Amino acid sequence: RSQWIIGGDGASYDIGYGGLDHVIASGKDVNILVLDTEVYSNTGGQSSKSTPVGAIAKFAAAGKRVRKKDLGMIATTYGYVYVAQIAMGADQAQCLKAIREAEAYPGPSLIIAYAPCINHGLKKGMGKAQEEQENAVKCGYWHLWRYNPALEAEGKNPFSLDSKEPNWEGFKDFLKGEV
């Protein structure tokens, strides 16, 4: 029977990280989807361990001074956790592939989904959140990748970078698209 746990970045990167780590370390066949808004969205957009360095948020008015926790890479260090980073608006096929692979994987899986929210202050509005995800990937802000430990048993590289080479010229425009 399929088991999915869905939560936000605040619970996954910060206040609930111990629980998340415990579930992943258990080796049980459970799937976890983290909606990563990069701030505490439900309480007003405060900075968190998911907030990238330099970002301006509540409690980080001068810009966050420390780097974002790399939750996905931390999970890969176990060696037996399926991990993927997705952005549905950027690549729906990659998103579905990651979800299907996580579902089929006989152990813990963690999918981290880029999820723009109202606290990003999208100048084009939240109706363009899918477009924002696409721009985030195209400019190199957010990377699409998958780590499937089952591939090692087949003698294959378990890591797959699904993003194309970034267009760095679009990075500045991407950042300007948010308040």
What are these regions (language model features)?
Residues 1-46, 82-83, 89-106:
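Thiamine diphosphate
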Residues 32-39, 56-65, 166-169:
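Phosphate-binding glycine-rich loops and adjacent basic patches that engage nucleotide phosphates
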Residues 47-69, 127-147:
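Acidic, Ser/Thr-rich peripheral helices and adjacent loops at domain boundaries
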Residues 51-104:
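Conserved thiamine diphosphate
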Residues 95-179:
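Glycine/aspartate-rich loop-and-adjacent alpha/beta segment that forms the canonical ThDP
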